[in-house]
């Protein structure tokens, strides 16, 4: 097994992760990632797919697209495991109450990316991975600091 740390960008195709990918492509942040990985819910706006097609031409490292299936189809057809999208709730008077639990992020974004990272690192499902094998870059701005959390898997170090 190669002892070099695998470096990946979790590319959400938003401002932060796209900026990180482009800065890395120009050598402004290092090390050069081995891959960028985009988790496709198959329900993204058209401009996201257009952006991904463009940014892919700018990167010296592969952009890999993964999916757990269609979030839209799961919601509309009530698939076996319902992973609700981040819907906002409101009171009867129309005031915002908050977000429903964001289970879809785990099932449609995080899990497919982790599965691909395991594969790229050369590990099978449930196979033990040494601590610190992967560095995953996640684009989060300072106003979203509450989202910055350590990876639950010890084999992955998150970097923002």
Where are these regions (language model features)?
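Nucleotide-activated chemistry modules centered on ATP-dependent adenylation/adenylyltransferase
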Residues: 1-160
């Amino acid at each position: 097994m190669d002892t070099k740390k695998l470096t990946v960008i979790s590319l959400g195709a938003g401002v932060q992760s796209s900026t990180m990918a482009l800065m890395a492509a120009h050598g402004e942040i290092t090390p050069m990632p081995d891959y960028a990985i985009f988790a496709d819910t198959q329900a993204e706006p058209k401009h996201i797919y257009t952006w991904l097609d463009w940014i892919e031409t700018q990167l010296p490292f592969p952009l890999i697209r993964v999916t757990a299936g269609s979030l839209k189809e799961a919601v509309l057809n009530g698939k076996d495991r319902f992973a609700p999208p981040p819907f906002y709730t409101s009171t009867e008077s129309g005031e915002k109450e908050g977000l429903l639990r964001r289970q879809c992020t785990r099932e449609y974004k995080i899990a497919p990316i982790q599965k691909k990272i395991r594969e790229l690192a050369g590990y099978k499902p449930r196979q033990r991975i040494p601590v610190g094998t992967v560095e995953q870059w996640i684009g989060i701005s300072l106003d979203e600091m509450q989202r910055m959390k350590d990876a639950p898997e010890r084999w992955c170090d998150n970097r923002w």
